[in-house]
Curated annotation (Swiss-Prot):
Binding-site list for Mg(2+): 678, 717, 721, 884
Reactions performed catalytically: N(2)-formyl-N(1)-(5-phospho-beta-D-ribosyl)glycinamide + L-glutamine + ATP + H2O = 2-formamido-N(1)-(5-O-phospho-beta-D-ribosyl)acetamidine + L-glutamate + ADP + phosphate + H(+)
Organism, as annotated: Sodalis glossinidius (strain morsitans)
The protein's name: Phosphoribosylformylglycinamidine synthase
Keywords: ATP-binding, Cytoplasm, Glutamine amidotransferase, Ligase, Magnesium, Metal-binding, Nucleotide-binding, Purine biosynthesis
Broadest EC class assigned to this enzyme: ligase
Gene3D superfamilies tied to this protein: 3.40.50.880, Phosphoribosylformylglycinamidine synthase, linker domain (1.10.8.750), PurM-like C-terminal domain (3.90.650.10), PurM-like, N-terminal domain (3.30.1330.10)
InterPro entries found in the cross-reference section: Class_I_gatase-like (IPR029062), FGAR-AT_N (IPR040707), FGAR-AT_PurM_N-like (IPR055181), PurL_large (IPR010073), PurL_linker (IPR041609), PurM-like_C_dom (IPR010918), PurM-like_C_sf (IPR036676), PurM-like_N_sf (IPR036921)
PANTHER family for this protein: PHOSPHORIBOSYLFORMYLGLYCINAMIDINE SYNTHASE (PTHR10099:SF1)
Biased composition (Basic and acidic residues): 995-1012
Keyword Magnesium appears in the UniProt entry: yes
Pfam family name, one: GATase_5
EC number(s) reported in the record: 6.3.5.3
Gene: purL
Residues covered by region (Disordered): 304-326, 995-1017
Amino acid sequence: MEILRGSPALSAFRINKLLVRCRDARLAVDDIYAEYIHFADVSAALDEDALSRLQRLLKYGPSLAEHQPQGRLLLVTPRPGTRSPWSSKATDIAHNCGLPQIKRLERGLAYYIQAPQLSEPQWGYLAALLHDRMMETVFTRLEEAAALFAQHAPAPVTLVDVLGEGRGALEAANLALGLALAQDEIDYLFAAFTRLGRNPSDVELYMFAQANSEHCRHKIFNADWVIDGQPQAKSLFKMIKNTFEQTPEYVLSAYKDNASVMEGSAVGRFFPDAQAGRYDYHQEATHILMKVETHNHPTAISPWPGAATGSGGEIRDEGATGRGAKPKAGLVGFSVSNLRIPGFEQPWEEDFGRPERIVSALDIMTDGPLGGAAFNNEFGRPALTGYFRTYEERVDSHNGVELRGYHKPVMLAGGIGNIRASHVQKGEISVGAKLIVLGGPAMNIGLGGGAASSMASGQSDADLDFASVQRDNPEMERRCQEVIDRCWQRGEENPILFIHDVGAGGLSNAMPELVSDGGRGGRFQLREIPNDEPGMSPLEVWCNESQERYVMAVAPERLAEFDAICRRECAPYAVIGEATDALHLSLDDAHYDNRPIDLPLDVLLGKTPKMQREAVSLQAAGFPLNRDGIKLAEAINRVLHLPAVAEKTFLITIGDRSVTGMVARDQMVGPWQVPVADCAVTTASLDSYYGEAMSLGERAPVALLNFAASARLAVGEALTNLAATHIGDIKRVKLSANWMAAAGHPGEDAGLYQAVKAVGEELCPALGLTIPVGKDSMSMKTRWQHGAESREMTAPLSLVITAFARVEDVRATVTPQLQPARDNVLLLIDLGAGHHALGATALAQVYRQLGDETSDVRDAGQLAAFFRVMQQLVAQGWLLAYHDRADGGLLVTLAEMAFAGHCGIDADIGPLGDDALAALFNEELGAVIQIDEADRDAITALFHQEGLADCLHYLGTAQPGDRFILRAGERSLYSESRTTLRTWWAETSWQMQRLRDNPESADQEHASRQDDNDPGLTVALSFDPKDDIAAPFIAKGARPKVAVLREQGVNSHVEMAAAFHRAGFEAIDVHMSDLFTGVQTLEGFHTLVACGGFSYGDVLGAGEGWAKSVLFNLRVRDEFEAFFHRPQTLALGVCNGCQMMSNLRELIPGAELWPRFVRNKSERFEARFSLVEVTQSQSLLLQGMVGSRLPIAVSHGEGRVEVRDAAHLAAIEHAGLVALRYVDNYGKVTENYPANPNGSPNGITAVTNASGRVTLTMPHPERVFRTVSHSWHPAEWGEDGPWMRLFRNARKQLG
């Protein structure tokens, strides 16, 4: 093992945060220094050249002050027996850089701690503070890290002696292996193996437990029910399926695949052909995938990997739909207990304790969203909507006074995708078809996830919780998706016959499901499974939940073609079996020459005993809200601080919201980029205005008083969130229903039945809505010992509804941004039928009450009519602004609209009744719309025609200025500055950012919100975007070739190719593997573009691993150098491509002064819609644009310009190499956050070389070449956004 020191790992503010944590824990630590340490497992000693090359590889990241370590060492590494994603990707880079003798690289974090006063027990506590025990371990000597590379002989299979010891042997195995088998399932297995006349293996039992867990089989939703002594006619699942039976329109696939599919639009899908790699549009029906998953248990145990693999698993579900599909846009949601932010605790937050094995709500919301965002970011999927709720209280609910809250959290991951019409249904698996696992190797992680997720937290052994934690490697999943893309893009020639993702239960669930669904059996070879940990037993190899894997069937004659695709995409795969005619499953172990699995499929997946559920109905008593002492001003302040209501910027800007170039509506609204969007909208393609929309509905606290109302409101809210998008027929809207409950808790089972019936049998059929997809999680309870007291925390019955719809015209979507300069009217549409119920509202929660009567869907007919009217108003363009009423009631609806419009409001709520608190804070369904005064009569008439006249209330107007005024007639109820309200609303997000990120950055952003004079994004163009300067050259018919270059992990190449294609280029897909193998060269190209993403997951510095793979490969290095020295060539590097090319400066003439691009000052991935100024420079791509100020998509974690010193910066400026700078909304060059999202000096965010032929930019012009893909834009812009000029300049330069 070679040990190599790396660079310092922690910035000053990170060190300071650690010291503060130590102080808070009463640990006397004087100083901490941390640096990376690299460990190389080598097959042969490294010679001088190889060692030098390796040392260069391992020099990466920002330049921080390093010094000789002092103090005691605590070395944090991945747990021995696991392999980190960092290791996988760093090892790939080493191999591509000519270091084949590197068997494996691994990285540790060495803390050198000066703390002479600490006792040994305190050192142990400090070590616990510094690492995540679920993923890491701590050594005290560098040499101990050799344990990371220890090799063990394969463990053998274990037999369970059922024939000798009887049923008791199964009961013992059930406990020892954490199988979570019910008694009737043990009976079933005992009978089955007695009949087979042999003993089961541990792997067979484990496989059975995973395949038949509640998590996988949904036994409760398929059970027979008896409620209050009365047998029920339908199971829960049958009631859900009733929605499809009543409204099957537009649904193409439901209940039978990894995701459901609904009818989409006929558009031009843009992708390269299989032969020449030439990008073009392919006009075809493009249908819409829908999927929403939960990943609750893993997120409670270890939030980052739990949430990351939750998003990753849902993405795989989409990609593995039909015969292969394309994930497109995602959503993420969280329900947790109270945050109790240190120093910012709220009056309603009490600490009720929690089990040691799960983390706090604050830790979940610090790390979980980062994990979910990181996976989506690195995979290349924009995360465009979500929700966040906190609840934790002692309440008098259905079962009397008890603790209700989300110690077991909800982690929701969902999204939309697209699929070809011919691939919606899976194919047929022929006998002899090759059964393949695509993706990463098996590792001893995530064991028992399906069974563990099916238990209440506290029931399983802590070691089993430990074992069920998973690891994420999104860059690997991206490679696998590229393989799937290459396959579906072949159309009828798609080599994939059948595909499933690998999720809960690992291969033990995925492979039986694959062959069984295909009507076949399977014969498998254990030792053909790629395996990074040879010491694993057959059970561990077959059942582990290593992520980023798919299983599929490929015909033998197509295997060579499939192999070539995988090699090009650097995606590992293995043929591990073949399909058989006999419906039998066998797994042979060549190492031990035995057969760990030898089972008829019907034993594994046959008719296991059907669950019978008996339940008793309970009804919460409910007590009217005690309003003594509740003052309106204080109530507003409290409600604006409740996380479900408060600003969620800290959850949003960590996630890429522009990748694909097809995002038409993200969370951020208007020139002030306020996170208040009601729904997410994407374009169906890069050449149309058809699209897809998704929104969420969720009112879980209401279930503490009324189960059915809570479910109905979730459906209603999803609809009101979607209503201001141009959809048309309500039957176009399809729902996902995700049900979370504490099964078996008194009252909850009957409540679940009531809720499902209310939605599946009543409301959805009445509205014409279908629920073709969903998920259930039935173990939402935690138990622990609190001193001498046993405690339980039970989540409310929680239904999260996600609404999906095809969009007729994405340009018509209306946002909450008020237009104060118009002669306008604000109207409330109240669907509460005059009810102002305050039970289980935000107001009740912040005063630690529950209340009695709750909101509800008062009239399904009125809700349907409301949707119809909104669709007419949207289609006609009569709405100026729209926002639904939800958490926080009318007060929050109006406030958020004012925030988005940066304006004042004068609202008269007198007509809503004498009870101002009830009028402002009830959460009945409804919306506020802003219209032109001139259209008022026509719009009112429309409401009358639909029978909604009584729902319509005139409120007042939006006005320029800063005053937020509420009146009852002439009587003033409340007057406050909108800026003050905005500050209150943002404080929760600010405090979370301060804890998690660089507090200096968080403080700067919070200060910027308090500038009432902020003009918002202010655009000034020095050219006309409608002027197509490339048109004369396109007219000549010649399309010069542009090499659209990507490396493994790059994810922004398609929109880049589309932008160049529109400018008149022939865009060619070029993978780095094409250059390494010599299949492709750069000789025939005039233009080279390196695209954005996460090459190699950015593990050796953003873009640095990619660059070094060029620099250390002599032939490829020469090819790049020749290209850059060739006259008349152009090159563009964007984001990751910018980082990569900046590290090729030694090959590029006139690039000697280029800076490095390193970690953002905030030390967080930043996704922003930023204002930049085009500066005077040599850049040929920015000619004619100088002086323009225009918005652009920013998405990076390492974009800060780093120079050697002040003289270096001055030289860059003097040489005229600066091409773009960040400016604030006043047009001034800035280093302030977030206008400058990465802290680059002098606002520098793009540079060029001395000739102007090579331009590097961190922001993404290719993602906003269409106006429709801007988060906000001036109303007068046409189809082409102003950044299209950059690509047309390129075409003009080539003549």
